[in-house]
């Protein structure tokens, strides 16, 4: 799946699991229809709603040089009742 980077595990995303909503970080250039298609194809579920927002990059400093990280996009995907995504593993750091 080129468009989906990884699942997000924050306090809010864990709370949303109870409402059958899953949170993913996705490629910034991906469209909503592409993400919906990939989720339905890969996980075998039916998507009824998608919300997205773009998170800004962070400012990083290395000595006198000031730079920033890239912004990224986060999607909150709501599934039809009766469908669920199998347990996702956390990304190890």
Swiss-Prot record:
Give any Gene Ontology cellular component.
chloroplast stroma
Pfam families recorded: Ribosomal_L23 (PF00276)
Can you say where in the cell this protein is located? Plastid, Chloroplast
Q: Name one GO molecular function term.
A: structural constituent of ribosome
Main location group: plastid
* Keywords assigned: Chloroplast, Plastid, Ribonucleoprotein, Ribosomal protein, RNA-binding, rRNA-binding
Please indicate which superkingdom the organism of origin belongs to: Eukaryota
Q: Name one GO biological process term.
A: translation
| InterPro entries per the UniProt record, alphabetical | Nucleotide-bd_a/b_plait_sf, Ribosomal_uL23-like, Ribosomal_uL23/eL15/eS24_sf, Ribosomal_uL23_CS
- Tell me yes or no: is Transport among this UniProt entry's keywords: no
The record's listing under HAMAP family reads: Ribosomal_uL23_B (MF_01369_B)
Subunit-level organization? Part of the 50S ribosomal subunit.
Family (UniProt): Belongs to the universal ribosomal protein uL23 family.
**Which purpose does this protein serve, as stated in its record?**
Binds to 23S rRNA.
What this protein is called in its record is Large ribosomal subunit protein uL23cz/uL23cy
Gene name on record?
rpl23-A
């Amino acid at each position: 799946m080129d468009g989906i980077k990884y699942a997000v595990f924050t306090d809010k995303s864990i709370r949303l699991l109870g409402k059958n909503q899953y949170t993913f970080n996705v490629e910034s250039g991906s469209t909503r229809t592409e993400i919906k298609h990939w989720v339905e194809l890969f996980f075998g579920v039916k998507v009824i709603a998608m919300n997205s927002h773009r998170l800004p990059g962070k400012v990083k400093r290395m000595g006198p040089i000031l730079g920033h990280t890239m912004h990224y996009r986060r999607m909150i995907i709501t599934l039809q009742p009766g469908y669920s995504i199998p347990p996702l593993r956390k990304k190890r750091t």
